[in-house]
A protein has these predicted regions:
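Glycine- and acidic-residue-biased ligand/ion/polar-headgroup-sensing regions
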Residues: 81-84, 91-110, 209-212, 219-239
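C-terminal segment of classical bacterial N-terminal signal peptides
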Residues: 18-29
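Conserved short histidine dyad/triad with adjacent acidic residue
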Residues: 74-91, 129, 202-219, 257-258
Length: 290
């Protein structure tokens, strides 16, 4: 259930006009240079403008993979407007939330919007199973990416079961919610949760420098990828041909299908992605045809 409050928001408009005269602008890439068909049986993807949205009690939602009410991995996006809050609740299993845009205000225990901490785009939250928590938005809205293993439903918390701890920076109970702020994250790739070589959910952040490409490879189990920054260029054939790739920008979603051969790279700009799946899984490289 959500609580909606009203606020007065400043309204501003800006118009930017750029005129290019007396010169021609040419941008050339060594990838994506021709019409490309991605093998959707090896790798499926959804561009931001292709996502299907529906209104729910939790906000405007786009389901990307699986179903939280059913067994297995799930992934979905929620958009919430300004001044929208959830009531204290808990989940059956751990849930993992990444802030894609805007600011999320998170709290634990008794509902109190003043006892929350802000998480900006790129920040990550682990909601621990059974832990009572709440969250919401203030003057700006938020876009959130959720992943986890179902079935895991939302259960409202009884008022008598909520407690309040700490003050200031200590308002988040780490036994209920574990927070990783974007500004405190390492600048290189790292594991957020789990281990892909062991049973259970794993979550990884991967950063790539410009023009950093993988070899053609496949995975033993499906995994899902969210582009958090830059552009991910994806292909689906053993050749690893960079000219036969499709650009997936920030906010795009990719499903690597088990046993499907694929490859990818960062192009001319740095790339930042989040990878999630269920272990144990392995990556097997594929030699290009001779």
């Amino acid at each position: 259930m959500t609580i909606r409050t009203r606020g007065t928001l400043p309204v501003c408009a800006a118009t930017v006009v750029v005129t290019l005269a007396g010169a021609s602008l040419s941008i050339q890439h060594s990838f994506g240079a021709q019409a490309v068909v991605i093998d959707r049986g090896s790798r499926d993807y959804t561009l931001p403008e292709q996502m299907q949205w529906r209104a729910t009690e939790d906000g405007t939602t786009s389901s990307l993979y699986g179903d939280p009410s059913k067994p297995g991995l799930y992934a979905y996006i929620v958009k919430r407007g300004p001044n929208v809050w959830s009531k204290p609740h808990f989940h059956d299993n751990d849930r993992f939330v990444t802030v894609l845009d805007g600011t999320l205000w998170v709290g634990t225990g008794k509902f109190d919007p003043q006892r929350t901490v802000p998480l900006k785009a790129g920040s990550f939250v682990r909601d621990i199973a059974g832990g009572i928590h709440f969250e919401g938005t203030k003057d700006d809205g938020v876009t959130l990416y959720f992943i986890g293993i179902g079935p895991s439903l939302n259960h409202p918390a009884e008022a008598s079961t909520t407690t309040t701890i700490g003050s200031g920076a200590d308002v988040i109970d780490p036994a209920v919610r574990q927070v990783q702020r974007a500004e405190e994250m390492p600048k290189e790739s790292f594991v957020l949760y789990g281990d892909s070589s062991k049973p259970g959910l794993y979550v990884q952040y991967q950063r790539r420098a410009p023009n950093n490409w993988s070899r053609p490879h496949y995975h033993s189990i499906d995994r899902v990828v969210m582009v958090l920054g830059g552009t991910m260029w994806i292909g689906t054939e053993p050749s690893g041909d960079r000219t036969r790739t499709v650009a997936v920008p920030k906010g795009g979603f990719i499903r690597d299908i088990a046993q499907g051969i694929h490859y990818d790279g960062s192009g001319n700009d740095p790339m930042w992605i989040q990878i999630a799946g269920v272990g144990p899984t392995a990556t097997t490289n594929v030699d290009p045809p001779k």
